[in-house]
Each structure stands twice: as C-alpha cells, then as structure tokens.
C-alpha cells in the first residue's frame, strides 16, 4: 500500500504546492492502479480527494503558520505515535517535502523548488534555517525525490549533492475540464496572478505598464493572489484572492498573461493561461522557458522595456500565441503525472 502523508498541510497556506497535491490525489483516485491511503492532519480532514484515508488525531491541530510550526516541532520530537499509524504502508510519499513522521519504509519526497538556496536574500534567517533543516534533510533521506522541472532537478543535484538517479522530473498537470477556452470576449487588460512576494517582480511590471500605456492607454493590469500592501499606479486593479472560477474567467477574458517572475520551480499560471486560450508573455528564467516550450514570448525579467515589447508582440500576434499555447498546455495532465508517480512508487515496492 502507498501511504501519502499530508500532515504538514494547513489549507490555504501552502499555495501552489497544495493545488498541485490536490490535483495529483484526484488523478490517483480516478486512474490509479495501486492501493492508497492518505494520512491527514486534523486541520484538513477532507483533503483526501476521494482516496481512502485516516485522520491522525495525534498530530496537533494547526490552522495557521505558527501553529503549523508548533505541530511540526512536536511531531518531530515525539514521532512514534504517528509512525505506528503509518506502519502498514509499503512506501510513503510526502507531497509537501517534509518527512513527518519519518518512517522505516522507503520514501518519496516532492521538492517543489529550492528558492531558499537559489535566492537566500528573500528569506529571513529563521526561514532559511527552517527550510534548510527540514527540506534539505528530507530530500537527502528519501529514496526518491520528485521535482516539477528539469531546472529544479539540476538545482537539487547541484545544491544538495544528490545522486541524479534518485531525482525524477514529473511536471504538474492541470484540470483541463476547468481550464479551457470559453466564449468570453477578450478585454483590454493584462493578468498577473501572483502573490506580491519580492521575486514576483511587481515593481518592474509597473514600469513596463507605464511604457505600454503610452502606446495603448486603454490597457489595464489586473492582479490576483493577495499580499499587495503598497500603493499601485494608475491602470492597476488589485483583486486579491479570487475563487478558481473567477480566475478561469480572468484567463478567458484577459488580452494576455504577463508573468515577470524572477524565480519559479514550475510556473503553473503559464500552463493554466495557455489552456484557457490566453496568450502568454513571461520572463526567460529557466523553469518558465522549459514549461512554456516555445509557446510564450519571453523577456528579461528586470528590463521594463523588454517586458513592454514582449507584451506588444503578444497582443499583435495573439492568434498565433493562442494556438501554440493550447497545443503546449495539452501535454500537461494530472493523469500523466499520476502514471509517472506510480512508476516511481513501483520502483520502491
């Protein structure tokens, strides 16, 4: 039996890794061929996505980031009650990287990125220490490490010193039943769905928007994702957190997705936008170039003029970018990801 340990999940706090994990579980429930059991924390008793499950009441209830850290510390100090609950698993998978509880069975860890090592200046000393302790140690202890892109694989092998044969690339999928083209008219706005972390590069995007509006004064920029606390320039609309249905609607109505991030392990919004028929302009960082696969217009992330020029190119050639994007997005499915994960599990059985 394959155990999937989600004990460190606090719903709504883990961003893209939570969405990716739920997508994988849903696909395993639909098309999986192995027996599964999901081990859930009391804070997320419904996160099994249709697979058999146990809620481990021995794990401390956690509804916030601080409570999550406390629960993790207690589980690390006193792992035996949790280990007993997982003893029937032949292989244990930790989709949120941290091996809690540690077990004697072979383990698979999903490592979404190594941003704390690649861009350490963006993290506090405490956060760097936490990630180095739990992420690095968990990856080194696992029999297999799964990453979403070749970029993260190279970083993992280089920075953590792992044997390349232990690290497998399995790209994320998307729900094509939800992320699909609609009949909406395209409107004169650009979409950037990203929480306002420093590496998301909002300030440079604002500079590019000012340049764009000299030539296309009707253009607006719509932001989603939360975290926006500073004032924004004219032409910027801050939506904050939006529902999945609202996000799909925005993808279907936006003239283009613009994604100027300085760092990504995968870049899920790029694929989601393409699947909705939204043309994409994104930064030329390795993970986004890899994921876009030539179907997006790329630019240097810190060059406002280059961002503006890329957006104008996408707007002028929208039909071409739309078709290329739809073709590229079709290759990213959770069913394919689930099949590759099952290949990894079988290696350890």
PLM segments and residue spans:
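Carbohydrate transferase catalytic cores enriched for Leloir-type hexosyltransferases
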Residues: 1-349
């Amino acid at each position: 039996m394959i155990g999937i340990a989600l004990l460190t999940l606090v719903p709504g706090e883990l961003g893209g890794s939570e969405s990716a994990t739920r997508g994988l579980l849903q696909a395993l429930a639909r098309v999986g061929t192995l027996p599964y059991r999901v081990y859930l924390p009391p804070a997320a008793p419904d996160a099994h996505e249709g697979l058999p499950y146990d809620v481990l009441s021995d794990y401390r209830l956690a509804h916030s980031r601080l409570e999550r850290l406390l629960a993790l510390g207690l589980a690390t100090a006193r792992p035996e009650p949790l280990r007993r609950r997982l003893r029937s698993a032949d292989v244990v998978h930790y989709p949120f990287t941290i091996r809690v509880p540690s077990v004697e069975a072979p383990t698979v860890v999903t490592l979404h990125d190594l941003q704390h090592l690649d861009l350490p200046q963006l993290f506090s000393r405490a956060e760097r220490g936490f990630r180095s302790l739990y992420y690095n140690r968990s990856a080194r202890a696992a029999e297999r490490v799964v990453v979403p892109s070749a970029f993260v694989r190279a970083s993992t092998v280089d920075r953590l010193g792992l044997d390349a044969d232990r690290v497998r690339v399995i790209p994320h999928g998307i729900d094509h039943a939800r992320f699909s083209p609609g009949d909406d008219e395209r409107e004169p706005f650009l979409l950037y769905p990203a929480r306002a972390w420093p590496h998301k590069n909002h300030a440079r995007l604002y500079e590019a928007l000012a340049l764009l509006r000299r030539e296309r004064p009707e253009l607006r920029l719509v932001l989603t994702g939360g975290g926006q606390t500073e004032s924004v320039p004219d032409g910027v609309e801050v939506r904050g957190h939006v529902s999945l249905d609202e996000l799909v609607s925005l993808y279907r109505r936006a003239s283009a997705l613009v994604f100027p991030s300085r760092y990504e392990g995968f870049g899920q919004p790029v694929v989601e936008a393409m699947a909705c028929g939204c043309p994409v302009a994104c930064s030329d960082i390795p993970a986004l170039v890899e994921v876009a696969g030539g179907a997006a217009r790329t630019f240097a992330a810190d060059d406002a003029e280059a961002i503006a020029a890329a957006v104008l190119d996408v707007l002028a050639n929208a039909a071409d970018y739309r078709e290329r994007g739809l073709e590229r997005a079709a290759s990213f499915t959770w069913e394919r990801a689930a099949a590759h994960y099952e290949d990894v599990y079988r290696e350890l059985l």
